[in-house]
């Protein structure tokens, strides 16, 4: 299952990327948290139909 990861850098720039599976999502989020350069990180599931699920916030400063 695919996931979309949304994030905001500390300077306010917002961006997003897609991950192929939960393992890739978790590794990317873990790396982002360890870097300490973000003020917002969230993810949501992308279903096979193309619909997005509920957004889950990981970091919100």
Residues covered by each model-derived region:
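Helix-centric, low-specificity signal for extended rod-like, repetitive segments
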Residues: 18-19, 28, 38, 48
């Amino acid at each position: 299952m695919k996931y979309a990861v949304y994030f905001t850098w500390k300077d306010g720039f917002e961006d997003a990327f897609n991950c192929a599976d939960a393992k890739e999502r978790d590794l990317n989020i873990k790396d982002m948290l360890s870097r300490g350069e973000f003020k917002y990180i969230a993810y949501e599931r992308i279903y096979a139909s193309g619909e997005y699920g509920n957004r889950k916030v990981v970091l919100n400063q």
